[in-house]
């Protein structure tokens, strides 16, 4: 990242994000500099407002993205494809982007192949990073996920063993008397 292109505050945030330990969430990496609101954008609209950045982790460092021969706008967004060799089927890869117009936002990624993801940029050159979340994680709320799989049966088994043991003990005591 060519830090000389950005304000001191943005330089400090970029350094903080790039110096975050592996596995740190986007929310924790921002720390005190976390924006009040981060929105998720698709090709042309806000998909979700005020998403939860604690569901995301970094897949790449923060880097410059420069548009030379084209100027992205909200009416004419530019599709950019990225290579992400560590992408798996269990994760959703999106882009953390510092929009010159809106500030920090997340651009929805579209999986192109096993190691490529694309996103639409609606503003000019700035900084961005590939981020990911587990596919089961919700980005907009703290809703409880529906239960998947079988319920745990150990409480029933423990209860059954207790009652069978109690029955055997009662039967033994009644025969002795």
Protein language model features and the residues they cover:
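Exposed aromatic-hydrophobic patches
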Residues: 79-83, 116-123
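Solvent-exposed strand-loop boundary residues in beta-sheet-rich modules
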Residues: 99-102, 134-136
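Surface-exposed loop/edge segments in extracytoplasmic proteins
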Residues: 101-109
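Feature for mature exported/ectodomain regions
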Residues: 1-58, 70-92, 132-154, 174
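Beta-strand signatures of extracellular beta-sandwich domains
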Residues: 94-96
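C-terminal beta-strand-rich structural cap/linker in extracellular carbohydrate-active enzymes
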Residues: 118-140
């Amino acid at each position: 990242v060519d830090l000389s292109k950005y304000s001191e505050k943005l330089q400090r945030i970029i350094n903080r994000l790039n110096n975050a330990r592996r596995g740190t969430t986007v929310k924790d990496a921002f720390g005190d500099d976390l924006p009040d609101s981060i929105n998720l954008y698709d090709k042309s609209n806000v998909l979700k407002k005020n998403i939860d950045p604690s569901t995301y982790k970094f897949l790449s460092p923060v880097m410059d993205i420069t548009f030379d021969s084209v100027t992205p706008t909200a009416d004419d967004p530019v599709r950019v494809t990225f290579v992400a060799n560590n992408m798996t089927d269990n994760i959703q890869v999106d882009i953390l982007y510092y929009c010159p117009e809106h500030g920090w936002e997340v651009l929805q990624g579209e999986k192109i192949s096993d190691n490529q993801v694309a996103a639409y940029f609606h503003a000019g050159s700035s900084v961005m990073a590939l981020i990911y979340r587990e596919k089961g994680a919700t980005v907009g709320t703290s809703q409880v996920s529906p239960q998947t799989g079988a319920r745990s049966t150990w409480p029933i088994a423990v209860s059954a063993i207790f009652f069978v043991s109690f029955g055997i003990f009662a039967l033994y005591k009644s025969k002795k008397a």
